[in-house]
Each structure stands twice: as structure tokens, then as C-alpha cells.
Swiss-Prot record:
Pfam families documented for this protein: Ribosom_S12_S23
Molecular-function GO terms, alphabetical: rRNA binding; structural constituent of ribosome; tRNA binding
Gene3D superfamilies tied to this protein: Nucleic acid-binding proteins
Recorded name of the encoding gene: rpsL
Family per record: Belongs to the universal ribosomal protein uS12 family.
Domain of life: Bacteria
CDD domains assigned to the protein according to its UniProt record, in alphabetical order: Ribosomal_S12
Modified residues (3-methylthioaspartic acid): 89
Subunit architecture: Part of the 30S ribosomal subunit. Contacts proteins S8 and S17. May interact with IF1 in the 30S initiation complex.
Protein name: Small ribosomal subunit protein uS12
Region feature Disordered, mapped onto this chain: 1-30, 106-128
Role played: With S4 and S5 plays an important role in translational accuracy. Interacts with and stabilizes bases of the 16S rRNA that are involved in tRNA selection in the A site and with the mRNA backbone. Located at the interface of the 30S and 50S subunits, it traverses the body of the 30S subunit contacting proteins on the other side and probably holding the rRNA structure together. The combined cluster of proteins S8, S12 and S17 appears to hold together the shoulder and platform of the 30S subunit.
Keyword field contains Lipoprotein: no
Source organism (scientific name): Dictyoglomus thermophilum (strain ATCC 35947 / DSM 3960 / H-6-12)
Length: 128
């Protein structure tokens, strides 16, 4: 326990916060190239085949990124935009691919929550 005098002289050093998405290096998004597009099985109570991609970012770091939405057009050498955000039931997947940006097309036939999946507004045929 420091004395009051020691605290006046030196002060307390704030703890450094550890990033949850270190590969982005402080950027909101990073561009990358898909190395491998595959599926993963989730942790214990859940069961599915989640679509993921191994992405090499422009800074040379390779990460696993989740492909959200139903259906996708990604394959090897697709250029994608990656954001932070983990997938709770997939260990090691700490990033998301942004749909509707670069080579990742938006989700087809989506009516609600379109902005999260890069889907354009559907053409209205009469009434709203």
C-alpha cells in the first residue's frame, strides 16, 4: 500500500485494456482475402453447420470469420471486409464478414433487418 506522498509523486498507473479483436489493430474493419471457406460445428448444447471462412487480412494476420445470413457466394480468393464480433458457440471465431461489401453479396430475399445483411430494398409492386 503506497503512502499519500508516494501517490502524489507517482500516481496510479491505469490498467491497459486488452482488445477482443487484436487482428484489426484498432481499425473498425479490415479487408482480407478468403483462403478457405468451410463449415464448423458449434459447442455442446447447439448443433448446426455454421459457415466460416479463413481470411488473410491486409496486415498479414490470418483469422476465422463467420459468414452471417442464409446462403453466400464466397469462395477461395474472394475479397471480403471483416469486422470484429465473436460467435459465442464457435471457439476461435472472433470476427464477422460484412455482407454486401466487396465480393460478399447481400442475403437474397431478406425483408427485415436488411441493413445487417447488405440487402437492397425490394421493389414495391403497388401497395406498401
Amino acid at each position: 500500500m503506497p503512502t499519500i506522498n508516494q501517490l502524489i509523486r507517482k500516481g496510479r498507473e491505469p490498467k491497459e485494456r486488452k482488445s477482443k479483436s487484436p487482428a484489426l489493430m484498432g481499425n473498425p474493419q479490415k479487408r482480407g482475402v478468403c483462403i478457405r471457406v468451410t463449415t464448423m460445428t458449434p459447442k455442446k448444447p447447439n448443433s448446426a453447420l455454421r459457415k466460416v471462412a479463413r481470411v488473410r487480412l491486409t496486415n498479414g494476420v490470418e483469422v476465422w470469420a463467420y459468414i452471417p445470413g442464409i446462403g453466400h457466394n464466397l469462395q477461395e480468393h474472394s475479397v471480403v471486409l471483416v469486422r470484429g464480433g465473436r460467435v459465442k458457440d464457435l471457439p476461435g471465431v472472433r470476427y464477422h464478414i460484412i455482407r454486401g461489401a466487396l465480393d460478399a453479396a447481400g442475403v437474397e430475399g431478406r425483408k427485415q433487418g436488411r441493413s445487417k445483411y447488405g440487402t437492397k430494398r425490394p421493389k414495391e409492386g403497388g401497395k406498401k
